[in-house]
Amino acid sequence: MAGILEVCVDSLASAQAAIAGGADRLELCSALAVGGLTPYAELLQQIRAQSRIKIRCLIRPRAGDFLYTKDEILLMAAQIGNLKRLGADGFVIGCLTADGELDTAAMQPLLKAAEGTGLTL
């Protein structure tokens, strides 16, 4: 089984370099210096205008832990909907409980918003 070369990018230039280097898929982020945040919609549009490479967008509204409030979950679901409309092929998501377990209840609105796309947890 062949692997997939996914490259994390946060700019048009890094996306172009990844594509030229043979990437199969991009993980699109912003602010990699803080571990990555949700990318700007305009950056997705720029890349999509130049390439049909598969793009999964990180959904992370802030730096720090992965314990999200209900308002943050609603924001994340809205971000998924917007980026999905603009051509994202999938999303990279994750919510944790205070015990460090996957918070499946918190992730339900995100899974619903991302329906029909690829997911990385």
Regions found by a protein language model. Give the residues of each.
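Hydrophobic faces of well-ordered beta-strands that scaffold small-molecule active sites
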Residues: G3-V7, L26-L28, I47, I55-I59, ...
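Active-site-adjacent beta->alpha loops and helix N-cap segments on the catalytic face
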Residues: L12-Q16, A20, L32-R56, K70-A78, ...
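Non-catalytic positions within long, well-ordered alpha-helices that form the structural scaffold/packing
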Residues: I19, K84-R85
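Short acidic/histidine-rich motifs immediately flanking catalytic phosphotransfer sites
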Residues: G22-A23, G87-A88
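A short acidic, helix-capping loop that chelates divalent metal ions and anchors anionic groups
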Residues: R62-Y68
